[in-house]
Amino acid sequence: MRLTIVPPQGFNEHIEQAHAIHQEAQVSPWKLSTFADCFSKPYYGVFAFDNDKIVGYAIMLEVVDEATLMDIAVDSGARGKGIGRALVDFVIETSVKNAMREMWLEVRESNHTAIALYESSGFQHIETRKNYYTVKNNDNGHDKSNGNSAQKENAKIMKWTNPTLA
């Protein structure tokens, strides 16, 4: 696997592959045009490749000295191979390099795998947003047992603090 910043050549082919992963991973995916906009300033996008196939992506927004991990996903057939870890490590390294004081993200309360990854990368749970995410009626990938209505799920808000600026 190689992690590569979005190259200007072949962007359309790459963005469509990444958008397919986004559509699979998200309950309410963005339109292709909205998704593509997130790979240009002020956003920062990166693709993870396995040979010539995109197997994951991350989108980050930097404003002044604060970053937000806007979206991250790994192709379902490529999970468990360290791609998510490589993407999170890359955005953290980018934040350190760009002197970001902190990075924020939100994650579904039921996404225990992602939460464990973020916590092991230094993110801390700061607060919970009640009934934040939409849940599909027959969405087997998400636990609806958090006490909310059948259509909503809580979001954990997590923060990483740059140790070089603390």
Show the residue positions of the predicted features.
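Acetyl-CoA-dependent GNAT
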Residues: 2-77, 88-90, 94, 98, ...
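Acidic active-site catalytic centers that drive phospho-/nucleotidyl reactions
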Residues: 14, 111, 154
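Positions that flank functional sites
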Residues: 37, 110, 132-133
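Short Asp/Glu-rich motifs
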Residues: 41, 114, 137-138
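Conserved glycine-rich acetyl-CoA-binding loop
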Residues: 71-89, 96-102, 109-116, 120-121, ...
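Acyl-donor (CoA/ACP) binding surface of acyl/acetyltransferases
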Residues: 78-81, 85, 130, 150-157, ...
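Conserved catalytic-core motifs of GNAT/GCN5-like acyltransferases
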Residues: 106, 119, 124-156
